[in-house]
Amino acid sequence: AGQLNDLGSAIGNAVEERLKSERFKAELITNVSHDLKTPLTSIINYVDLLKKTGVEDPKALEYIEVLDRKSQRLKKLTEDLVEASKASTGALTVNKERLGFIQLLDQALGEYEEKFEKSGLSPVCTAPDHELYVEADGRHLWRVIDNLLGNCVKYAMPGTRVYLDVKAWDGNVVLSVKNVSREPLNIPADRLMERFVRGEESRTTEGSGLGLSIARSLTELQGGTFRLDIDGDLFKAVVSFPECRALTAAPPL
C-alpha cells in the first residue's frame, strides 16, 4: 500500500510540474508576443504610410510590398502563438450559445471564395437542406472552420476539389474536410496536430504549423472532437460537436 501511495504521489507531482511548465510557457509566449506587438504595429503603420506616398520607383514598390507581406505574416504568427498557448492550457473563455452550423460554414465559404479561386481549388459542399444546430462559442467555432479552410488553401494541390461534408450522426453534427495534398504526407496524422509541425518538409508555403493544433484545442475546449486521417496524399479532417436540437414552441397556457 505504501508503494502505491508513493507511486500515486509521484504521478501527482509529475502532473503538477507539467501543468506549471505549461503555464510558464503560456505566460512567456503571451509576454513576448505582447512586447512584439507595439513595434510591429508601428512597422505596419509606417508601411501603410509608405504605400500612400505615391512612390513610383518599381524597386521601392517591390520592397514596400515585401515589408507589408512579411509584417502581416509576423502579426498573424504572434496572434497564433498567443491563441495556441491559451487554447492548449484551457485559458480561453468559452461562451456557448445555440449556433446554426451550416449557416456559419456557408459564411466562411463565402469569405474564402476568392482565396480558393486564386489557389485553383474548387470547393464541393454537401449538407442537409435544413439547419443543424450546435452549442458552441461562435468566435472559437469560426476559428476552427477558418483554420481548416486556410489549411486547404495553403497545402491542397492546385486544380483539385476540396470536399466538405456536413451531417447529423449519432447525436453529433459532423464536418469532414477532404483534399489532396500538394506535397507527400510522410508524417503520422497525430504529428500534424502538434504545434509547429507541417506536413510538407520543403516549407515552400507560408504557414506557422499552428493552425491544426489551434483547431483541435478549440474544438476540444468546446466539448467537441477533432480527428485527422491520412491516406497517401489524401488529407481528411473530421470535426464533431454534440447536436443541439431545434427549439420547440412552448405549449399555449
Predicted segments — roles?
Residues 95-109:
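A conserved beta-strand-to-alpha-helix junction within the catalytic ATP-binding
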Residues 129, 184-197:
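Short conserved segment of the HATPase_c
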